Amino acid sequence: MGRPGVRIPATDLAAHPRVSGGCPAAHHVLMDPSAVRAHRQVTALAQADLPLDELGAELSVALGGVVPHEGYCLIGFDPISGLRTFQTDRNTLVGSPARLVRNETLEHDLHRFTDLARQPSPVGTLGGGALGEDRSPRLHEILVEQGFSRELRLALRDRATLWGALVLLRERGRPPFTAEQAVAATAIAPPLTQAVRQVSVRLRGQPPPPLPPGVVIVGPDDTAEAISTQAAAWFSDFAAAEQPLPYVVLQAAAAARTGLGAGADQLARIRTRSGRWLGLAACPLDSDHVAVVVQPATTDQLLPALAAWYEFTPRQLDVLHLLLQGHSIKQIARRLELSPHTVEDHLKTLYRKTRTNSHQELIAALR
């Protein structure tokens, strides 16, 4: 019988008052200078405002001394719908993402991201002989087929929200991830979660004008039966060129086919490389085919996710909504029955949270 899987408390272990007495593995890791250094480096990366690919590369280097790995994948999720919004990786799984989408959304497997987000521990490992690994499709049909035999997954979550995930991979012949290494990965989750939230909304420069809406018809075999010119233009602004279809397109199509999340928000809000806001949603055409629509995200579509990413309060969101509609401070104050001074205070907080300095910058950052 396999040994139990790793289960580590979902907390910043370096700050936990009981960790040294209650978890020998955690105590060993926290006394290890390399683990302390990795935590400090990741905390600094979270504050460095790096481009996505650079963040992933620097993160891999920072973790390499305490959790050695050959490949990594850093992922972001829409906090409302749970659809994938970005990914950066190196030496990881190649080819069409359709098989991974099927594993993550339809198959029963160990350590799916949504499962890790709900469990006491946000970390899970494959390839160490844990109970149930002999029946893991991801391990035997995906990882091993591509030359990997060990996987560590870390859900980046707080409270009830899944913001992103980190996947570390080891090639065949490499040792399994240890309990100490799982603890070290868990310890960097809080600063890495903050970094992922910032990357999701970051604006670099003035975005170009929005592109027209586009559509993709996804067939029963998860291939594109038709892609409009407009959809292809959107994909070139946020997806890897070598992908037949972006992961999020197939993920949205799978959710539409199965009715997962029916009646709920199933929109992926994606900040593209150029700074545009894209809204992506899918609807079934028949039992086999799905239409995926890509178009500029509207203000009303963006606000729920922006409120989550930036931690806007309900009142701050009220002020922001009216500001984006073109109302002046006096008009906002009158509509919300507040003093102009109070509205100004709310705006100052919005500037701070979004790292902007004026109405114009704030509006540009959120459109």
Specify the residue positions occupied by each region the protein language model found.
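PAS-family sensory domains
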Residues: L211-R271
